[in-house]
Amino acid sequence: MAMVETTGRDSKFIGNFTLTDIGEVDVITETGIIPSVKFKIKFDNGSISEDTTLPLEELGKLDWYSLHPHLKLCQKLPTAQQNLMNLIRSALPNSPKQTQYQVKRLGTHTIDGEPVYNTGGDLIRCSPITKNCTNILLVSQGYNLDIDQTLNESEAAAEMMKIVSLCPDVGRVIFSHLLLYIMRKAYKDAVIAPCCSLFLYGGSGQFKTTYSTFLTQIHNRSKGILRPDRLNSSIPGATELIYKKSDCVVVLDDLCPRDSKKTMAQQEETLLEIARIIADGTRPAKFRGHTVPRKEPPSCGVLFTGEYLIGTGSDAARLLPIRLTTPIDKVKLSECQAKPLVVSTFFHYYIKWYIEKYSTIQDLLRKWWEKYTKTDLGVHRRLQETHFFLNTANKIFLQYCMENGLTSPEKASVHHQSFENLLNCLVQAQDVRVKQGIKSNPNNVDFFDVLCALYKNGDFHVAKNRKRFNSSSSKYDGLIHNELLC
């Protein structure tokens, strides 16, 4: 069977195939509608290819040899391109027009009313009972959510919690930040888009970067954990990096003392500018000294790492610092690193649940947001929003655990209260820096003022004597001894 071009009484062979199922398609993308065509290739031996879909304007430039290794042309490529384009165009008026949604960006999409999640190599959709029959084309971007098939859902969750518990306070905050940005679109459509950044800081050699990158990378983990991008890149370079990412957390490393004051100043400037972009949804105009608004803010979160704090006033309000006080146990970290697919496997299960419960999650977010708007934590507005984002992401995770029998309501309640108390301490301590404009070096922080703020808000409890402090039921954080706070 051969493709034939008919011109008057003359017929010419074009190749060793014919085209079938030719049709016109409106391909709907995030930026608009692309008029396109689709067809299948049927070879002389009877085999038929998968659908080929491409923009109508690219039809005359198509490299036909790239479509299939067995395809042969009997004409020179430019001539064949023209003849095949004419043949396809002539068939379009007699074929029904179809609609196809093209999914390219990683993360959550709402298509024809149905939430779907692009993992890179697959689409996670609702169960067959609730999903619609929308035609969706997945455009591969070289990413994949690698899964350990030997881990069931409860095992994956248990192993994930081992990673988080390597550094309980830091781990829980980073984990909730990652959950938040995986569910970014649900937040954006229901209440408000996430716009908060974390800053993990502590001394050198504490495995800050190793831990944070291992915990936050969800794609291509079978190929190894990638080294994070560094803060010594230019502001335009770092800006382009975060605008290429979506529904994930980007780690930017490493703010530390340098011999060169110029280098330190440049890194600090980059960190603060990226924090502004995440919080405000603006990006800098290249080298013009001002910012220009984007139609959309970045769709990823950022986790900075460093050895000292920076930022005062409104800059401090855009960051939530978490201090790593002791090095992460190297042996336990190595044990977790030996199972790199735990994180991506856990999120495979979690995202399936998230997509299935998408509308329920949005309803919960609306209810919680209404309560938050009537609550005053006594901190800067941005810090209160950060508290909302991280606290509710953790609550949704606990809901997932309860629905799947991974924890009891009683344990979930204890976990929630503990995490909320942790967030209270973090945002209140940072609010002191916001209000007082404390210098960024941690050696200059007035921790007495921080403790006063925590005590005033009921998050720091002081015992009046050693007996109370040492009692088995003690819930005190410090004690007054010889007129000193210990």
Enumerate the language-model features and the residues they cover.
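Conserved glycine-centered beta->alpha loop in an early N-terminal alpha/beta scaffold
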Residues: 1-169, 215, 240-241, 245-247, ...
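Ser/Thr/Asn(+Pro)-rich, low-complexity disordered segments
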Residues: 47-54, 61, 119, 126-128, ...
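DNA transaction DNA-binding modules
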Residues: 111, 115-151, 162-163, 258, ...
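P-loop NTPase catalytic core of nucleic-acid-dependent motor ATPases
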Residues: 131-225, 387
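AAA+/P-loop NTPase substrate/partner-engagement loops
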Residues: 201, 210-264
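AAA+/SF3 P-loop NTPase mechanochemical coupling elements
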Residues: 243-245, 286-305
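Conserved catalytic/switch belt of AAA+ P-loop NTPases
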Residues: 267-287
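Phosphate-sensing "switch" segment of ASCE/P-loop ATPases
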Residues: 296-301, 313-408
